[in-house]
Amino acid sequence: MPTRSKIIYTFTDEAPALATYSLLPIVEAFTASADIAVETRDISLAGRILASFPEQLGTKAIPDHLAELGDLAVTPEANIIKLPNISASTPQLQAAIKELQAQGYALPDYPETVTTDAEKETRARYDKVKGSAVNPVLREGNSDRRAPLSVKNYARKHPHKMGAWAADSKSHIAHMNNGDFYGSEKAVQIEAADAVKIALAAKDGTTTVLKEKTNVQAGEIIDTAVLSKKALRSFIAAEIEDAKKQGVLLSVHLKATMMKVSDPIMFGQIVAEFYKDALAKHATVLEQIGFNLNNGIGDLYARIKALPADQQAQIEADIQAVYAARPALAMVNSDKGITNLHVPSDVIVDASMPAMIRDSGKMWGTDGQLHDTKAVIPDRCYATIYQAVIEDCRANGAFDPTTMGSVPNVGLMAKKAEEYGSHDKTFQIKADGVVRVTDSQGNLLMEQNVEAGDIFRMCQTKDAPIQDWVKLAVNRARASNTPAIFWLDPKRAHDGVVVEKVQAYLKDHNTEGLDIRIMAPVDAMKFTLERTRKGLDTISVTGNVLRDYLTDLFPIMELGTSAKMLSIVPLMNGGGLFETGAGGSAPKHVQQLLEENFLRWDSLGEFLALAASLEHLGVTYNNPKALVLSKTLDQATGQFLDNNKSPSRKVGNIDNRGSHFYLALYWAQALAAQAEDTALQAQFGELAKTLAENEATIVAELNAVQGKPVDIGGYYAPNPELTSKAMRPSNTLNAAIAKLK
């Protein structure tokens, strides 16, 4: 099979991985008719862990598929369909390691404390798997995310529920006013290709190299910033008191998954401040059992189980005393007593803030009811945009999905741009002093005063991605005849340099008749919301973090979920990366499958990505059959939405597997109805007839398995045979698809 007719479909984690077992056989059968090979690559958390230890695993070793796809992404042949994957926190990583060890893989434990070189090596390998380790490797291009018309029209006809807003809502965002990254940012543009060094000159005269060498290119922007531990602690102490005084829930919204170095540290400091009385009282024993603040209070509950019962009870009683004295915390699961401060990866800002805004600005309390909430987002860089949304909702009420406009996004993300590429240049500082960034000649580029415990970070943004981003923004503005707003803050050093580049590169394009503006994020948000409420569309052109935040915020308001977005990454070397929506991997869906054999994951994102992938392949390699498949898949998706065949949430109704059957039925019918390719018409006419005649039988077979627990042999690494059996319970459907192949 020639390389050009190949689509790579990624195996990932949790709900999308389970859905793949049902959908992929259908996709393989349909695409084979156009001489397209669909191959899989495993970039799941379990797969990435196993690929990190080939020496230890011997014959059980597996290839490093992520590295392979990273190499592929910089070639013109790349055509990758990327499903959501876990961005692992430390507790998730440890759970996955434990599961794999139980399955017979000779993996080393995750070393929590590091003393030997071997432990350092093991820890470094595992840490590479943590956080958002996948997307930066594959995203060798910028981001084009938008709601397809069929999806937008469906949302207007079938609006999701939006909570009403009260004008006197006490919900608000709390952010630092000094001592944060925003207030300390410095930026420089690199004149010629070089390498820079990051070193800490401590007050005691010692120098510690934090990072020996970071290669930089001509025209690249590098920036540094510091978040003060002292300022963070005094800020959170004041906000805890204020939440108590106002009688609102206290919640914390970070991104400990992607920002895997900085945000767990911030989370840990908030845990330390909130529980300080109990933690101080039991400091010695908590240190002995290895409690790590950065892993959340859930880590404490897990570790005290090893203590004698009376000691355990005493610590638990003192924690309960903290809850009695402190403001109520927002809950992740009020039935199970899991708070916002239990696990750093449970509340992720880009998903949690839209959910709060959609729920009238409220979050769940211990009583299982919704309450007004103080949302703590410590750093000012992006916190203020959410406050602007809250103020808009307070003044104008909830958004109306039946009338609101759309906010597509063009996002700068190629080459690990901005904060999302900063992890290997982020450090918790060990001693008071000055962190200096110097070039290869020892010339000082930037310096930051620091104190022990502070978080220092350096970000990089290369010039070619900025040029490509500006071009993509102009192209989308023209193609959709929509205003495009660059969200850039002139008060941020980094953004100031980006503004100069944007203004220069816009001159390289014909912008006549286009409405392209540069606005500070809060102003851009107000402008966009005003247009949105009038039913008007506005393209947001943003950096990497706002790309992430806004492509959750607006789709959740417009469509009820970000998983229904068309998410295309036109790779800079000519290939295509097609992301299935902009959401996560839905662990609660897996829980429901295991308990009730019912998977409510909606594969609409996969359908949209596959259609875009087929179109790209058809255009790039002049494959007319691929174009017919793409066009008919779009038609089938429209019919799928119109006929309301998306998964429901409750047993006894259609779930993910049933939705795949209906997609196959409608796709086959669309292929049978088209006249562009008579061979495809004949081939799929028979399948369409078989599926239509057996609809009742297939639906009955799919639904018959629901309502009882199912064993798939693992969570992070489910057994392929058991999972396939669970996800393909209709023999009639399986036989029809097998016949097509």
Place the predicted regions along the sequence by residue.
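Extended, well-ordered protein cores
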Residues: 2-268, 277-501, 505-527, 531-667, ...
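Short active-site loop/helix that positions an aromatic residue
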Residues: 273-274
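Short, solvent-exposed positions on alpha-helices
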Residues: 627, 678-682
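Terminal, compositionally biased segments used for targeting/anchoring and flexible tails
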Residues: 643-658, 686, 708-712, 733, ...
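Ligand-binding pocket scaffold of soluble enzyme catalytic domains
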Residues: 672-675
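Short, charged, amphipathic alpha-helical segments
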Residues: 681-689
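A glycine-biased, small/acidic residue-tolerant capping/turn segment at secondary-structure junctions
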Residues: 699-716
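C-terminal accessory extensions/subdomains outside the catalytic/core fold
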Residues: 718-741
